Amino acid sequence: GEEGVGKLSLAMAIHNESEQRDGPFISVDCQMLSPENILHELLGSDVGPSPSKFELAHNGTLYLDKVEYLSGEVQSVLLKVLKTGLVTRSDSHRLIPVRFRLITCTSSSLREYVQQGAFSRQLYYEISMNEIEIPPLRKRREDLKQMIDDIIDKYQERTRKKMTITPDANSVLLEYRWP
């Protein structure tokens, strides 16, 4: 889905309702890191030691946001870990077994990246078992009332104060031309 449609919230909801809910939820923004840094983050290091994101997500969920930005090398590493269930830290030869749910996310069509040769076809088929497209808010206006109520509930819980929204403010939100 487009930026800001709630992909992270959906991924966390999937995690929280799954058998992995008691395990960790590890999130990686693939666009924010250079290919070298993302490889280091995913694989970890024995120097330090710095566990891999795969290890940190063991028995939980690894969420890769903006997966279309992964380099070919990182795609190969990810595919290998998914197929073998083993990770080797970047400066080691030791195989570490890992088990995690992978949720990947993109703001554009991964299928188009595959057709252009910019994304591994093999990895695409490995990660696209259950595709969910989240439409932007402008296409699901009927969700607004529930979202407003959920946000108010969340802030009431956080602040332990009673909060309400005025009818005028509610109308402004419901009538706003959302992107």
For the regions a protein language model found, what residue spans apply to each?
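Nucleotide-binding/hydrolysis machinery
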Residues: 10, 16-23, 72, 91-101, ...
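Structural recognition of the conserved hydrophobic beta-strand(s) that form the central parallel beta-sheet
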Residues: 27, 63-64, 100-107
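Conserved post-Walker A coupling segment in P-loop NTPases
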Residues: 1-45, 49, 55-71, 136-141
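Conserved helical "switch/dimer-interface" subregion of ABC/ABC-like ATPase nucleotide-binding domains
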Residues: 17, 77, 81, 89-90
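Catalytic acidic motif of RecA-like/P-loop NTPases
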Residues: 68-69, 79, 83
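Conserved catalytic core of Hanks-type protein kinase domains
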Residues: 56, 81, 104, 126
